[in-house]
Regions:
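Short loop/turn motifs that connect adjacent beta-strands in outer-membrane beta-barrel proteins
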Residues: 218-229, 257-265, 296-307, 339-348, ...
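Membrane-embedded beta-strand positions of outer-membrane beta-barrel proteins
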Residues: 230-236, 267-269, 307-311, 347-351, ...
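Transmembrane beta-strands of outer-membrane beta-barrel pores
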Residues: 236-240, 255-257, 271-277, 294-296, ...
Length: 453
C-alpha cells in the first residue's frame, strides 16, 4: 500500500513539473494550491494579466476545478517569480461570502481586499491593476522594470525609454549621414575627385592645383533639393528574451526643414508595436530636435569633418492592457556626432545622453503610471564605403547603457547594410539590425527612405 502511495506521489510530482515546464513560456503564470491541502495544485498560464486574474478570482475557465475551494496562489509576472501573492476564502467575507486578498505585491505595501459584497471579484481585482490604485501599481512597475527583460516602459531594448533614445540616436547620430546635406551632394556628384587627385602635388612633378570649388567641365551637376527632407525608417525584428519569444515592428517618420547648411529643425513621429508571447504593447512619440552643424566640409573637397550637435525633447507613450502597464514619458537629451569624410570612406562616431521621466496616463477609466526615472547613454560608430557614386556599404555598432537600475544594464546593437544615394538627395538603405545582452537577443532588418521633399 505504501509503495502505491509513493508511486502515486511520484507520478503527481512528475505531472506538476511537466505542467510547469509546459507553461514556462507563458508571460504570466499562476501556481495555485488548496489551503490545507497543498497536494491539490494547479498551474495556469496566460498572455494577459487582467484576464488571468479575473478568471482566478471568479474560478472560471482553467480555474473552474477550484470553484468554492480556499486557496493560496503565487503569480509570475514577465519572468519575475512570486511577483504577486493572493489568497481566496469562499466564506471569509461579509455575511460569510467570498473574499480574495492580495497579500503581497512586488515593490508595494498595498494589500487590498476584494469582497463579493462589493460586486464581482474578477472585476474588482482587474480594476485594481488597471485603474483603482495607480500609486501601488507605479511602485510595482518600478520593480518590474528593474527585473524583467521584457518590461513595457524601461530597462530593456524593447522598452519605451530605449525606443525613444534609439530613434534620436539613429536619426541624428549613427545614421544621420543618410540624410544628405546640400554640400555633401555637391562634393559627391559635382566634383571630379579622380581628376583632382590626378592633379594633386606629386602627381605632376610637384605641381600645385588651384582651388577646386566649382564643377569641372562636362560633369553633371547634382540636382538642388528643396529645404524639406522627409525620412522613413521601418524595422522588423524577432525577439528572444530569456524563455520568451516575440516580434517587434517600428515605423519612424521625420520631417526636417533646412534653414541653412548649419541649422535644421526636425519633427519626428516614431511608432512601434511588439508582442511577447501574444501580449501586445503599443508605443508612440513626438520628438522635436534641432541639429546644429558647427563644422562642415569645404565645397569641392573629398576630405573634411562634420561636427553636429542635436539637442531635443520628446513626449513618448506606451500602453499594454495585457501587461496592465504603460504611461507617458517626457524626455530630453543631446546628441554629439562627428563625421570624418575620407574620400570614399566615411566614418561616423556618435555620443548621446537622454533623460526620461514618467507621467501618469489616463485613457477613459484606465490609469497607468510608469514610475520611470531613467538616464540612457549611447555610444556608437559606423563606417560607410562608396563602391560607386550612388552605392555604398556600411557597418557599425552601438553600445547602450542604462545609467539607473534596470533589468538589462547594457546591450550592443550591430548594424550593416547597403545605401543607395541619388543626385536629388533621395536615399534608400537596406540592412540588418540587432540587439544583444545577457539572455536577450533581437534580430531583424531595416529599410530606410529619405526623400528631398
Amino acid at each position: 500500500m505504501r509503495t502505491r502511495q509513493t508511486a502515486r506521489a511520484a507520478i503527481l510530482s512528475t505531472l506538476v513539473v511537466v505542467a510547469g515546464a509546459a507553461r514556462a513560456s507563458d508571460l504570466f503564470n499562476v501556481n495555485l494550491a488548496e489551503t490545507g491541502n497543498p497536494g491539490n495544485r494547479l498551474f495556469v498560464g496566460s498572455s494577459s494579466l487582467p484576464n488571468l486574474l479575473e478568471n482566478l478570482a471568479d474560478q472560471t475557465g482553467a480555474f473552474a476545478s477550484f470553484n468554492g475551494v480556499p486557496f493560496a496562489a503565487n503569480l509570475t509576472y514577465a519572468g519575475i517569480d512570486n511577483a504577486i501573492a493572493i489568497q481566496y476564502d469562499p466564506t471569509g467575507g461579509a455575511n460569510g461570502g467570498e473574499v480574495i486578498r492580495i497579500t503581497s505585491l512586488l515593490g508595494s505595501d498595498a494589500t487590498p481586499t476584494f469582497d463579493r459584497a462589493n460586486g464581482d471579484l474578477g472585476n474588482q481585482i482587474r480594476d485594481f491593476f488597471l485603474k483603482d490604485d495607480p500609486d501601488a501599481i507605479k511602485d510595482f512597475l518600478k520593480q518590474v522594470n528593474r527585473r524583467s527583460l521584457v518590461a513595457v516602459t524601461d530597462g530593456n531594448p524593447l522598452a519605451t525609454t530605449a525606443r525613444s533614445a534609439r530613434y534620436k540616436f539613429e536619426r541624428f547620430g549613427i545614421h544621420t549621414d543618410f540624410t544628405t546635406t546640400e554640400g555633401e551632394l555637391y562634393n559627391r556628384f559635382s566634383v571630379d575627385h579622380s581628376a583632382r587627385r590626378a592633379r594633386s602635388p606629386g602627381a605632376n612633378g610637384g605641381e600645385t592645383p588651384g582651388a577646386e570649388r566649382a564643377p569641372l567641365d562636362n560633369l553633371p551637376v547634382h540636382q538642388a533639393a528643396t529645404p524639406i527632407r522627409t525620412r522613413f525608417h521601418f524595422a522588423a525584428q524577432y525577439i528572444d528574451a530569456q524563455s520568451f519569444d516575440g516580434y517587434s515592428f517600428d515605423l519612424n517618420t521625420s520631417f526636417e526643414y533646412v534653414f541653412s547648411e548649419h541649422v535644421s529643425a526636425v519633427l519626428g513621429f516614431p511608432v512601434g508595436y511588439h508582442a511577447v508571447e501574444d501580449a501586445d504593447v503599443f508605443n508612440g512619440g513626438v520628438h522635436i530636435d534641432v541639429p546644429v552643424r558647427f563644422i562642415i566640409p569645404d565645397y569641392g573637397s573629398p576630405y573634411g569633418l562634420t561636427w553636429q550637435v542635436t539637442p531635443g525633447v520628446s513626449m513618448d507613450l506606451s500602453g499594454s492592457v495585457d501587461y496592465a502597464a504603460g504611461g507617458v514619458l517626457w524626455s530630453g537629451g543631446v546628441n554629439n556626432t562627428f563625421i570624418f569624410h575620407l574620400d570614399r570612406l566615411r566614418i561616423v562616431t556618435s555620443q548621446q545622453l537622454t533623460l526620461h521621466e514618467g507621467q501618469k496616463l489616463k485613457i477613459n477609466d484606465y490609469e497607468f503610471d510608469p514610475g520611470v526615472s531613467q538616464q540612457i547613454l549611447k555610444l556608437g560608430a559606423k563606417a560607410a564605403y562608396s563602391l560607386t557614386h550612388k552605392l555604398e556599404v556600411y557597418g557599425g555598432v552601438t553600445y547602450t547603457d542604462f545609467l539607473k537600475d534596470s533589468a538589462i544594464d547594457h546591450y550592443w546593437s550591430p548594424t550593416a547594410g547597403f545605401s543607395f544615394v541619388f543626385r536629388n538627395g533621395a536615399n534608400i538603405t537596406v540592412g540588418y539590425e540587432g540587439d544583444f545582452a545577457d539572455d536577450f537577443e533581437r534580430h531583424g532588418g531595416r529599410v530606410g527612405v529619405t526623400l528631398p521633399f
